[in-house]
Amino acid sequence: MLSSTATTMLRAGVSRSSGALQPMLLRSAACPCSPFSMNTKLSQPTSVRPLSTSPSALVLRFRAQQQAQLAQQQLRRASSSSSSSSSSTRPRSDAELDANAAEAAAAAQSAAHAGEPVLDWNTFFKLRKTRRRVQLAFSVIMTLITSGAGGAVLSTGVADAMVAQVPLEPMFAVGLMTASFGALGWLMGPAMGGMVFNALKSKYRGQMEIKEGQFFARIKKHRVDPSASSMGNPVPDFYGEKISSVAGYRQWLKDQRAFNKKRTTFV
């Protein structure tokens, strides 16, 4: 009996001691300060990788694009400001440059020839009409002279070899040659008439040149754009050849404004 009881007690003590040892081992494994330390992965301190603070390649590319866009905007603003300042300081077109140059030339010519009679616009248009008539008369006269002289020369048979080479009837060939002589005389007429007119009106020659420069500068400045013309809206006297008075010039300006109004409003 004693032996069985002692055996039972020993077994109970061993089991009790083994049951108490198991949680102690667990506590030592969980706690690194325990004397029963175990080299496990949980007990070893894990190394924490520091977060990288440098930007990625995508962020750098986006920043570079933003900087390039800002630089382009600054360049555009600078160019627009410089162009606006330069446009405010210089004339807007070549027509204005021509008008300013013509006015400066007129002032210099009038100062250089102070003793000459002053030529107003009405007198200028009258002299211009007279010169045109003289040139037209000389064109007719030179046409008659050259055509008659050419016909007389051709009738002598000087150009028979040339007439034979033309694949037409001899009468038609001679007629064409005579007409060509007449056309040459028509082209020579304005030059001859201008020379005669300048000789007769020599005191107005310098003033007329100045007035012509001013007149054509005004025509170039105020005339319309011919590219916008059409069959229903033709260009009204593009070169100002029909202007023969101050009233005619004012009517020409009204025609230019009417053309622009019709072009913009499609009336």
UniProtKB/Swiss-Prot annotation:
One annotated GO biological process: protein import into mitochondrial matrix
Membrane-topology annotation of the record: Multi-pass membrane protein
Single GO cellular component term: PAM complex, Tim23 associated import motor
Membrane spanning stretches: 134-154, 171-191
Residue span of region Disordered: 71-101
Keyword Protein transport: yes
Compartmental location: Mitochondrion inner membrane
Sequence ranges of Low complexity compositional bias: 71-88
Domain of life, per lineage: Eukaryota
Annotated transit peptide: 1-86
Annotated keywords: Membrane, Mitochondrion, Mitochondrion inner membrane, Protein transport, Transit peptide, Translocation, Transmembrane, Transmembrane helix, Transport
Subunit record text: Component of the PAM complex, at least composed of hsp70-5/ssc1, grpe/mge1, tim44, un-4/pam16, pam17 and tim14/pam18.
Family, per entry: Belongs to the PAM17 family.
Function: Component of the PAM complex, a complex required for the translocation of transit peptide-containing proteins from the inner membrane into the mitochondrial matrix in an ATP-dependent manner.
Name of the protein in question: Presequence translocated-associated motor subunit pam17, mitochondrial
Source organism (scientific name): Neurospora crassa (strain ATCC 24698 / 74-OR23-1A / CBS 708.71 / DSM 1257 / FGSC 987)
Record lineage: Eukaryota, Fungi, Dikarya, Ascomycota, Pezizomycotina
